[in-house]
């Protein structure tokens, strides 16, 4: 049976960054790997960040998250059927940061997928700089996306103090308890180190972490109502201006509760990936991009967002 791994994590936690490393590790073991990338919204920005994996023999499939639940499940099921017929040994699924993991497990239980796929690992990415307070919907997603994880990886550990890393672990435990989930993570199940320092032994440990069956008390809400996205195409703003102004989106209450900003900008003939959360912004070179910036959050005011970007 094809092993299928799920990499979860709230918006901006660093799923795509880890996925690149994880998929490359499996490919390096001689395993035929395909990544199924599922982004929130109609434009799949994260898929462009994985272009370099193709050079390592990793194939990439995408699903747009900008649709209703039934349509999304149907698209995912169709993709998984197609991939099962192409001889992959391992499929790695990266859902959006507001994904309902129950939806994924429901799809895997459907025929004929239940005869072709076997759940391998569930890996949860949690930001070491996780804010102290989140909305009830965000707290639920944090808990539900982590409940089945065999391993939790803290991201941005190089930027966090020991107290902040411990605070993120406590926050996760609190979110799980609030959802009446019995899942508790022991020290051996949490990896809290700079990802640049992950060793071959660390990756091998993660690659066999498995999963734990758990359940959370369901919080019923429409993710597309609770979380919205604002798209900015062909803004025409220079990289320096965007890097200067994007942080203000997280601190200006009139913009709404901004959770994540991602996109691309061209600077002197080179493309850069912009990736920002409340904890900070990064700009990294990328082979190809497109003039798009996406803001994801709660109660967004697009006009105010653009006003801040153009200052």
List each model region and its residues.
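Short secondary-structure boundary/capping segments
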Residues: 51-52, 114-115, 143-144, 221, ...
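Conserved C-terminal guanine-recognition region of P-loop GTPase G domains, centered on the G4
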Residues: 83, 98-184
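Small/polar loops that bind or transfer phosphate-bearing groups
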Residues: 37, 93-95, 156, 234, ...
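C-terminal accessory "lid"/substrate-recognition subdomains
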Residues: 148-154, 158-289, 300-303, 307-311
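Flexible glycine-/small-residue-rich
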Residues: 37, 126, 276-278, 297
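Short aromatic/hydrophobic contact patches that present stacked aromatics
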Residues: 92, 228-230, 294
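Nucleotide-state-sensitive switch-loop elements of NTP-binding domains
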Residues: 2-13, 17-135
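Short, well-ordered beta-strand elements
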Residues: 291-297
């Amino acid at each position: 049976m094809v092993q299928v791994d799920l990499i979860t994590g709230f918006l901006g936690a660093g799923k795509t960054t880890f996925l690149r490393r994880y998929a490359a590790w499996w490919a390096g073991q001689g395993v035929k790997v395909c990544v199924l990338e599922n982004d929130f919204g109609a434009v799949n920005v994260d898929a462009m960040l994985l272009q370099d994996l193709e050079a390592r023999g990793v194939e990439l499939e995408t699903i747009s998250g900008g649709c209703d639940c039934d349509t999304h499940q149907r698209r995912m099921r169709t993709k998984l059927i197609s991939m099962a017929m192409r001889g992959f040994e391992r499929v790695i699924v990266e859902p959006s940061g507001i994904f309902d993991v129950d939806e994924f497990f429901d799809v895997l239980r459907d025929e004929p997928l239940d005869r072709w796929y076997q759940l391998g690992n569930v890996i949860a990415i949690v930001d070491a700089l996780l804010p102290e307070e989140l909305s009830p919907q965000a707290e639920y997603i944090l808990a539900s996306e982590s409940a089945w994880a065999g391993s939790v990886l803290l991201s941005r550990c190089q930027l966090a103090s020991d107290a902040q890393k411990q605070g993120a672990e406590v926050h996760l435990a609190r979110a799980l308890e609030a959802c009446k989930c019995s899942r508790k993570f022991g020290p051996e199940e949490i990896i809290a180190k700079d990802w640049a320092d992950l060793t071959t032994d660390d990756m091998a440990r993660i690659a066999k972490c498995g999963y734990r069956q758990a359940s959370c008390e369901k919080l019923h809400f429409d993710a597309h109502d609770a979380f919205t996205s604002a798209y900015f195409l062909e803004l025409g703003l220079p990289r320096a201006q965007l890097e200067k102004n994007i942080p203000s989106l997280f601190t200006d209450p009139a913009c709404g509760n901004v959770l994540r900003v991602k996109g691309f900008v061209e600077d002197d003939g080179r493309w850069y990936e912009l990736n920002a959360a409340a904890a900070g912004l990064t700009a990294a070179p990328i082979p190809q991009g497109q003039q798009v910036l996406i803001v994801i959050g709660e109660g967004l005011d697009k006009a105010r967002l653009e006003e801040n970007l153009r200052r």
